[in-house]
Amino acid sequence: NGQVTTFNHQGHLIKIPAPLVIIPEGYTFSVNIKYHGTPEYCGASGFKFDEHLGVDHVWTLSEAYCARSWWPCKDDPSDKADSVDIIITVPSNPDFIVASNGILQSMTQTGNKKIYHWKENYPITTYLVSLAIYPYTVWYDQYISQLSNDTMAIEHYVFPDRFDDSYSNYLLTKDMLLLFSDLFG
């Protein structure tokens, strides 16, 4: 109902009191959680602050139980989030680019910051939600289904120093999508 409520955070659980009415099974609702802090250490996975060629690099790897180390979620691989919005603010200098799941909804420049809004509209298990931040080289392509003529945007994000070595490999993406489309529909 758009109201701020209380919560209890113990261990890896956030408990939000239910309203005083019965919520029917299958009822869809959303919760907006403002989250900040230092991500919990999760071994080789989780939320990572790194450098590449002396430039800051942020990335995530959440498989299989490390999503909760960097964002509030039901971290259970057998369950899926209906959809996910990822909104990230980064400095404009260097020219950081945020890559994430789904489709980029917007990128807004505000002073010396950029705000990226990505949205995944399909059910996704929480450990597959990811983000990567770096001044990447980005290029775009498009897959066109031979069966339906449906199109799908393809976006490639790569470290600039690895572009030449990786470009020819990324050109295989459309052939791979064709194969997977033939095999799985």
Located regions from the model:
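Short secondary-structure boundary micro-motifs
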Residues: 53-55, 70-73, 153-154
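Hydrophobic helix-coil surface modules that form long, contiguous segments used
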Residues: 62-63, 74-185
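Short edge-strand/loop segments of extracellular domains
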Residues: 48-64, 106-108
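Beta-strand-rich interaction surfaces with strong enrichment in secreted/lumenal proteins
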Residues: 3-6, 17-22, 70-76, 104-107
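Generic recognition of long tandem-repeat/solenoid scaffolds
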Residues: 14-19, 55-60, 115-120
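A surface-exposed beta-strand-loop module
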Residues: 1-52
